[in-house]
Amino acid sequence: MRRLPIFFLLDVSESMAGENLRQLQQGLERLVASLRTDPYALETVYLSIIAFAGKAKTLTPLVEMAVFYPPRLPIGSGTGLGAALKHLMSEIDSQVIKTTPERKGDWKPIVYLMTDGKPTDDIKDAVYRWQKNYQQKAELIAIGVGQYADLEALHKLTPHVVHL
């Protein structure tokens, strides 16, 4: 059966500490609980968690929903969105199964990017690479949290931007 890869690209910078991080953790848990009630999602959805602050790190590689458990999110300094995007693109390249003449690949991945700040690294190259090579391969939904979220930077990546 074809998989539906869902990547969560989560800002875990110091500004997310406290209530924002708690809400993020609870939101992940509620989403997973909701998806687990859908038999089709149980068979097709694979989840991955990538956390970023100054650097990006995969906390959970793509794993089937039935065995997924939301990891504890670490806190770091900086909001390295450029590094996070590069890491995400590498994960898409290595973990998403492509369609070949012999078999159907994965469904188009969905990426949920959540951040509450302004990038602290240069995002220009990563944004260009995303737009050129990945924008058609994956559906990205960006969520800006709070009054300091850089919505302009998020709009460079996707037209699907939500501000909370």
Annotate the PLM regions.
Residues M1-T60, V67-W107, I110-M114, I141-A153:
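Von Willebrand factor
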Residues T99, G117-L157:
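VWA/integrin I-like adhesion module and closely mimicked acidic/polar interface patches used
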Residues E43-R72, L151-L157:
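Short beta-strand-loop
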Residues L28-R36, H87-I97, A126-W130:
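Short, well-ordered amphipathic alpha-helices
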Residues V161-L164:
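Short acidic-hydrophobic, aromatic-tinged amphipathic segments that line or gate anion-handling sites
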Residues Y40-T44, P101-W107, Q135-K137:
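Short helix-terminating capping/connector loops at secondary-structure junctions
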Residues L4, A33, P101-R103, K124-D125:
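P-loop NTP-binding core
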